[in-house]
Amino acid sequence: MGQKVNPNGFRLGIIRDWTSRWYDDSPVIAEKIKQDHVIRNYVQARLKREKAGIARIVIERTTKHIKINIYAARPGAVVGRKGEEINNLSQELSRITGKEVKIDVVEVIKPETEAQLIGENIAYQLENRVSFRRAMKQAIQQAMRAGAEGIRIRCAGRLGGAEIARAEQYKEGKIPLHTIRANVDYASVTAHTIAGTIGIKVWVYKGEVLVQRIDAIEEDELKRINERRGDSKSRPRDPRNKRRRRTKRS
C-alpha cells in the first residue's frame, strides 16, 4: 500500500502536519477550502517570476485574520527591498479574501533536499530543452551531497521529444515508503514542453523521525497493547492459578 499512496498523506498526523491548520464546522467550509487553493495558486504564480523557490505554503485562520507561512529557498525575493514585495502581496491577498492577511517568510535551509523544489528545477530545465537524464542525475547528486539518505525521480511523457511516450526513473539510496516514521518528502510537478506535458515525481528520504506524540494514541489502545504483550501491571494475576500449580506439584 505504501507504494501506491501519497507519502505525505500517509504520514499526516504522525510525523507530518497539515498545510491548512484551521477548523470550521459551518456550511461555508467548502468556500474556505477553495479559498486556500486560490491563495496557494496566486502566491505560487506571483513569486514564480521572482524565482523565490517556494517549497510549501501553510495557511492558518482565525476569526479576524489569515496567517500565511511561506517556506522559501530565497526569502529575500519574497520580502523585497524594505519589505515592499511582502506588503504588496499582503494587500493583494486581502482584496481576494476580504480579510486581513499576515505573511511570515521561513527560509528553507537545504533546498536541494526539498522534493517540490527539485521537481520545479527539473521542470524548468526540461522546458528549456535540457536533457532529462542530465537534469535527473544532477538533481540526485545535489540531494545526496546535501545530506539526503535516498532519492528517486520519475519522469513520464514524450521524453526527448520521442514519438512514443515512456517513463524513466533514477534512484540512489533507500526510500522506505512502508515505514511511517521515515521522513519521506514527495512532490509531483508538470513540465510543459513543446512535445507535450511531462510528469515529474520526486521522493526524498531524509531519515527517521522519533515520534514523541504518544498522546495521539488513545489510552484504551495502550491498554490493549499492554494486554497483548502480557504486561503484569496491566493484567492482574488470578489467584486460582497458584492453587492449580500447587495441586499439580503435590
Swiss-Prot record:
Compositional bias per record (Basic and acidic residues), positions renumbered to this chain: 225-239
Residues of the KH type-2 domain: 39-109
Gene3D superfamilies referenced in this protein's UniProt entry, alphabetically: 3.30.300.20, Ribosomal protein S3, C-terminal domain
Bias type Basic residues, positions: 240-250
GO biological process: translation
One GO cellular component term: cytosolic small ribosomal subunit
Region named Disordered: 225-250
Pfam families assigned to the protein according to its UniProt record, in alphabetical order: KH_2 (PF07650), Ribosomal_S3_C (PF00189)
GO MF assignments: mRNA binding; rRNA binding; structural constituent of ribosome
Keywords tagged on the record: Ribonucleoprotein, Ribosomal protein, RNA-binding, rRNA-binding
Superkingdom of origin: Bacteria
PANTHER family: 30S/40S RIBOSOMAL PROTEIN S3 (PTHR11760), SMALL RIBOSOMAL SUBUNIT PROTEIN US3C (PTHR11760:SF19)
Family membership: Belongs to the universal ribosomal protein uS3 family.
Function recorded in the entry: Binds the lower part of the 30S subunit head. Binds mRNA in the 70S ribosome, positioning it for translation.
Record's subunit section: Part of the 30S ribosomal subunit. Forms a tight complex with proteins S10 and S14.
Name of the protein in its database record: Small ribosomal subunit protein uS3
